[in-house]
């Protein structure tokens, strides 16, 4: 079982974030029956709303290399679809809402011959702090009810939180691009960006300049304001 943790922020405002993603080279009918995750480094487990274990199918034989997902599990650009897992590639196997230091997931999904993909999603509670950090390990996994060898791709890195200040489709705009961020003398955060109403493409298009403001170090953001129109 090959396991990787992508080094991207966990967005508090998302329903699903990639916590770990997995690849299994299987024979037809093999089953990844069980696996466990262990949280370390003092995370407040009450900040976690849910953990979900997904099966994501197989791989095209023509695609070369060692990958950890067949597609992007959560879109960064599809309007209204940037906060939750793509259901076409995320078949839920189990979900845990009673979060403990060690969490166990189960599955009865038969795998196909060749490469099979899985991933675990994490959803934070809205009140979770942006300062939250944690690491996670996988102490155990079973395939066909037998212990599986777990191979990590990279070290056990610290994961951090973030907020999606703007998402595709917010306020009726197709995309937001070219961001900037400044801190004023009194600590207020100002985020600026293109508001691309019709598509994410470059000029020539209908584009305004938007501003978002936070007075609590990025934990919450005021409604968007249009700073410049063209």
Provide a role label for each language-model segment.
Residues 1-160:
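Exposed, polar/acidic Ser/Thr-rich sequence context and nearby capping/turn residues
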Residues 58, 89-94, 114-119, 123, ...:
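Asp-box/BNR beta-propeller blade signature and adjacent active/binding-site loops
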